Amino acid sequence: MNNNGMQMPQARYVLPSFIEQSAYGTKETNPYAKLFEERIIFLGTQVDDTSANDIMAQLLVLEGLDPDRDITMYINSPGGSFTSLMAIYDTMQYVRPDVRTVCLGQAASAAAVLLAAGAPGKRACLPNSRVLIHQPATQGTQGQVSDLEIQAKEIERMRTLMEQTLARHTGRSAEQVRIDTDRDKILTAEEAVEYGIVDQVFDYRKLNG
């Protein structure tokens, strides 16, 4: 966790910290804290309750600091919980700043919906990004017949909501999204633009230097 109690994306190496000097003295910081100072949120883990709470808190804090400046969310995530996805999604739509979304690596399942939910014209992929969309995953269900019926209705509700959400942000019909997500649909960066999940593929900064 960082100094604010937020969980940082897990790394297979030691996360470096460094000393930063300013007119007010010195302080120890780390890459994720520096990104936050630049109004950048990094989703680099599975979408679950913990990561959702962290991201929602950062969105709300950044809105309070400056409601008129964009927030950028970088995404490299295999997806995860549908309820956690919708919690982040609602917060992205709720806050006043535009939320830019950028995929680097992959945006799969729930993370693909978050990628598409960025502000119109402000959604992008890096060239070798991978985007995967499919219907919400469900765990094995058990219980009484009446409970199974309730669970089946909830599964269908979640699927319909996800389809409507993707349709809203891609310009596709909900019916087309249902067909496309019946099985895994894997998109390259260029295909994600064609589908309407993002608006552009970023060039490497070195090429523009």
Curated annotation (Swiss-Prot):
Q: Name one GO molecular function term.
A: serine-type endopeptidase activity
| InterPro entries noted in UniProt | ClpP, ClpP/crotonase-like_dom_sf, ClpP/TepA, ClpP_His_AS, ClpP_Ser_AS
Q: What is its main location?
A: cytoplasm
PROSITE patterns xref list: CLP_PROTEASE_HIS, CLP_PROTEASE_SER
Gene Ontology terms describing biological process: protein quality control for misfolded or incompletely synthesized proteins
Q: Which reaction does it catalyse?
A: Hydrolysis of proteins to small peptides in the presence of ATP and magnesium. alpha-casein is the usual test substrate. In the absence of ATP, only oligopeptides shorter than five residues are hydrolyzed (such as succinyl-Leu-Tyr-|-NHMec, and Leu-Tyr-Leu-|-Tyr-Trp, in which cleavage of the -Tyr-|-Leu- and -Tyr-|-Trp bonds also occurs)
- What superkingdom heads the lineage? Bacteria
Query: What are the UniProt keywords, alphabetically?
Result: Cytoplasm, Hydrolase, Protease, Serine protease
Q: Which CDD domains match?
A: S14_ClpP_2
Question: Where is the catalytic site?
Answer: S109, H134
- Cellular compartments annotated: Cytoplasm
Which cellular component appears as one GO term in the record? cytoplasm
Entry EC no(s): 3.4.21.92
Q: Name one Pfam family in it.
A: CLP_protease
Q: Which Gene3D superfamilies match?
A: 2-enoyl-CoA Hydratase, Chain A, domain 1 (3.90.226.10)
Q: Which family does it belong to?
A: Belongs to the peptidase S14 family.
Q: How does it assemble?
A: Fourteen ClpP subunits assemble into 2 heptameric rings which stack back to back to give a disk-like structure with a central cavity, resembling the structure of eukaryotic proteasomes.
Looking up PANTHER family in the UniProt record yields: ATP-DEPENDENT CLP PROTEASE PROTEOLYTIC SUBUNIT, ATP-DEPENDENT CLP PROTEASE PROTEOLYTIC SUBUNIT-LIKE-RELATED
Q: What does this protein do?
A: Cleaves peptides in various proteins in a process that requires ATP hydrolysis. Has a chymotrypsin-like activity. Plays a major role in the degradation of misfolded proteins.
**The name this protein goes by in its record:** ATP-dependent Clp protease proteolytic subunit 1
Q: Which organism is it from?
A: Corynebacterium diphtheriae (strain ATCC 700971 / NCTC 13129 / Biotype gravis)
Q: What is the lineage of its organism?
A: Bacteria, Bacillati, Actinomycetota, Actinomycetes, Mycobacteriales
